[in-house]
Swiss-Prot record:
One of its GO terms (molecular function) is NF-kappaB binding. The keyword Cytoplasm applies. It is found in: Nucleus; Cytoplasm. Scaffold protein in the commander complex that is essential for endosomal recycling of transmembrane cargos; the commander complex is composed of the CCC subcomplex and the retriever subcomplex. May modulate activity of cullin-RING E3 ubiquitin ligase (CRL) complexes. Down-regulates activation of NF-kappa-B. Inhibits TNF-induced NFKB1 activation. This is COMM domain-containing protein 6. Disulfide bonds: none annotated. Its main location: nucleus. It holds the Pfam family COMM_HN. The gene is commd6. It comes from the Eukaryota. It comes from Xenopus laevis. Residues 130-197 form the COMM domain. GO terms for cellular component: cytoplasm; nucleus. Component of the commander complex consisting of the CCC subcomplex and the retriever subcomplex. Component of the CCC subcomplex.
Length: 197
């Protein structure tokens, strides 16, 4: 079951990308993935890891790095879901990854595997996206190619969200004042409901 689920998540393709990653950088990536799963950090800092890769001459695109991060997060969360031992995990990966990478995975799983399995049992392992940050500001439209009525205030809302793999993305919304008031009203309603729980 464990191996089939990893195949369904596309881990085979991730394994080919992992082979070019130096063990020390791979260890940092694994550590951030595990911390994200344990809710100790809001996400994996893909940009900082990418810069580290570039600094040591590892030629990989940001998209390929995101695939590695998703793959490692999936590996650890799936291994926790099936409560696999370190030997079971390594026996499944031995034909797919180099020895140095397997040593990193062994170290990380020996250190954190038990805790991840406990979190999985209590359903506290990060299953989906998480709101990391929320910013808003009010502005005034003074020029536009598509808008005829200018000099109207608007609100820009930026939501930073970490997906299940820890990748942080920003979503920006521009709302009119009535739309923002409705948005605010809905958040107040949610807050009132949460206070009764």
């Amino acid at each position: 079951m464990f191996e089939r689920e990893l195949e369904a998540l596309g881990f085979e393709k991730t394994g080919d990308l992992i082979k070019i990653v130096p063990p020390d950088l791979f260890a940092e990536l694994c550590q951030q993935s595990v911390q994200h799963l344990q809710r100790q950090r809001s996400g994996v800092d893909c940009h900082a890891i990418f810069q580290s890769f570039q600094a040591v001459g590892v030629h990989i695109s940001e998209d390929e790095l995101r695939k590695i991060i998703r793959g490692m997060t999936a590996l650890f969360s799936t291994a926790a879901k099936y409560n696999v031992t370190c030997e079971e995990l390594l026996s499944m990966l031995i034909s797919k990854l180099p020895k140095q990478i397997l040593q990193v995975i062994r170290h990380v799983w020996n250190e954190e595997g038990k805790h991840l399995c406990e979190l999985q049992k209590s359903r506290d392992l990060l299953p989906s996206g998480e709101l990391v940050d929320f910013h808003w500001k009010i502005g005034m439209a003074v020029s536009s190619d598509s808008c005829r009525s200018l000099n109207h205030p608007y609100v820009t809302v930026e939501l930073k969200v970490a997906d299940y793999s820890g990748q942080i993305t920003s979503k920006i919304l521009e709302l009119t004042i009535p739309e923002f008031k409705n948005f605010h009203k809905q958040f107040k309603e949610m807050s009132a409901v949460l206070e009764t729980v």
